[in-house]
């Protein structure tokens, strides 16, 4: 009897212990699940766009948008090499352009472009169309074959390296299709040959800068300069963009009468053209100019450069947004070389410095430190900003927006897979002010802004970030613009009206 009791007690205690252990494990897993949900919710709450609450109509757009996004992501897991952000944009441009996701983003009012350069804007087709203008001459470099263009009533003077012929005659001689194909290859970096994608940074930059040389004489003809700017406003407006802050070197312009136009006169051309376009398009918010000469000026030339900055600011206090320096950072002079004279400029002149457009650490990227110390309002590219925690602290504290240009950073060899772009970290934390821009869309045959928004949404952003992200990025482009508080208020009202049209149209 006693032995039976012992057996019964042992069996009962084993069951109890098993039951107790199961209960404990269930509690531990429940606590783990709760903490995991909390982590995910906290991360989502920290991401850019999380403060936005979508309306019922916006939810309809969001459902379709996320359905398309998740399809791309799931397909990418099954076929990593087919995932669009893994690829070079040149290899998937045709796929992007034909996708419903891209079409929705393109129709979406995206606010403003805050980072774009003067002669790298319009579609290649439009630039080629300009070569049909009368009085246009060309020559080809005997070594590189690179074209030069010049408008003139008479044949320009030949040199050892340049024999001028009329473009019309050359096109007739070669055949229109052959000529235009050769010209296109010099006006665009677009190329589906992987070897061309995988060159080193300096080689890519030489090709990039070479395009500015090819289109220089064509676009700096004063009548064409204005027409080109107006055309970009038209293309930009059609791409769902209502506002522009344009970086320009203000290169000397010329006309057929031998007149050379200086920086003040060129600013006036921009100003008049902007007013003209706004009059014709009432929902266009406007444009401002950032004077951005190339960062190769020697010490002796810096004071004169700063004098020009002051002059332009005095003559166009509302239209000139501020000052920047452009060109390949790795090869150009660093900001510290200009700092002494920059510090002498009046406080009313704002800065929008390119900084950190590099993969180096502790070298070229130190421009980020100088940009912040000099009081920049925004940072152009800021690709290396994650390597500088002190700069990141100032970016947060002083609301210094980072102008992220995804497509440019890939084409110019900073990143291969968009998922590895440092902008992903910025989009994951709403404390970082960030805007998406396009830099030089003409050179990679991209739309003024839609392709960069697309890559940011599908490649840089989390799978969970949705329409709220895109809406916030559009809002940020107004919030961190150079507009005055009053101008920003009016701009927001104009953008909101277009956003409502977009949402209503989708729900119709």
UniProtKB/Swiss-Prot annotation:
Expression (tissue specificity): Salivary gland (at protein level).
Disulfide bonds, paired cysteine numbers: none
GO molecular function: adenosine deaminase activity; metal ion binding
Domain of life of the native organism: Eukaryota
pH-activity dependence text: Optimum pH is 5-8.
Annotated EC: 3.5.4.4
Pfam families: A_deaminase, A_deaminase_N
Keyword Ribonucleoprotein attached: no
Residues annotated as signal peptide: 1-18
Localisation per UniProt entry: Secreted
Cofactor(s) for this UniProt protein: Zn(2+)
GO biological process: adenosine catabolic process; inosine biosynthetic process
GO CC annotation: extracellular space
Catalytic reaction list: adenosine + H2O + H(+) = inosine + NH4(+)
The protein's name in its UniProt record: Adenosine deaminase
Species name: Lutzomyia longipalpis
């Amino acid at each position: 009897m006693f032995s039976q009791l012992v057996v019964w007690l042992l069996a009962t205690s084993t069951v109890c212990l098993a039951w107790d252990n199961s209960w404990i494990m269930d509690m531990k897993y429940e606590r783990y699940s709760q903490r995991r949900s909390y982590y995910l919710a906290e991360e989502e709450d920290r991401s850019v766009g999380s403060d936005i609450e979508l309306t019922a109509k916006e939810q309809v757009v969001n459902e379709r948008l996320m359905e398309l996004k998740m399809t791309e992501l799931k397909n990418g897991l099954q076929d990593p090499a087919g995932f669009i952000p893994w690829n070079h944009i040149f290899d998937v441009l045709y796929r992007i352009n034909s996708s419903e996701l891209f079409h929705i983003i393109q129709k979406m009012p995206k606010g403003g472009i805050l980072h774009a350069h003067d002669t790298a804007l319009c579609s290649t087709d439009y630039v080629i169309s300009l070569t049909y203008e009368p009085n246009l001459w060309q020559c080809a470099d005997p070594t590189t074959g690179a074209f030069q263009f010049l408008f003139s009533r008479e044949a320009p003077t030949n040199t050892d390296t340049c024999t001028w012929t009329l473009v019309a005659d050359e096109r007739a001689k070669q055949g229109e299709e052959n000529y235009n194909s050769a010209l296109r290859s010099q006006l665009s970096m677009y190329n589906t040959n992987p070897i061309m994608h995988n060159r080193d940074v300096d080689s890519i930059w030489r090709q990039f800068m070479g395009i500015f040389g090819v289109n220089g004489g064509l676009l700096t003809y004063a009548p064409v300069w204005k027409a080109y700017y107006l055309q970009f406003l038209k293309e930009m407006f059609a791409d769902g963009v209502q506002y522009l802050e344009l970086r320009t070197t203000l290169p000397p312009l010329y006309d057929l009468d031998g007149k050379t136009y200086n920086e003040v006169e060129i600013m006036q051309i921009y100003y008049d053209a902007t007013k003209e376009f706004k009059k014709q398009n009432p929902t266009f918010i406007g444009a401002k100019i950032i004077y951005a000469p190339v960062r190769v000026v020697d010490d002796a030339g810096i004071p004169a450069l700063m004098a020009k900055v002051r002059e332009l600011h005095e003559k166009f206090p509302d239209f000139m947004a501020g000052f920047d320096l452009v060109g390949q950072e790795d090869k150009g002079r660093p900001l510290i070389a200009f700092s002494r004279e920059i510090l002498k400029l009046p406080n009313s002149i704002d800065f929008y410095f390119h900084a950190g457009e590099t993969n180096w650490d502790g070298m070229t990227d130190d421009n980020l430190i100088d940009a912040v110390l000099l009081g920049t309002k925004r940072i152009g590219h800021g690709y290396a900003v994650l390597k500088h925690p002190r700069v990141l602290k100032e970016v947060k504290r002083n609301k210094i927006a980072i102008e992220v240009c995804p497509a440019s950073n890939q084409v110019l060899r900073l990143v291969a897979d968009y998922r590895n772009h440092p902008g992903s970290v910025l989009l994951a934390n709403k404390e970082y002010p960030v805007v998406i821009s396009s830099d030089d869309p003409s050179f990679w045959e991209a739309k003024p802004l839609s392709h960069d928004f697309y890559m940011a949404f599908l490649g840089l952003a989390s799978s969970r970030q949705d329409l709220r992200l895109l809406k916030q990025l559009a809002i940020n482009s107004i919030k961190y613009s150079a507009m005055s508080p009053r101008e920003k208020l009016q701009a927001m009202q104009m953008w909101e009206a277009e956003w409502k049209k977009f949402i209503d149209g989708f729900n119709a």
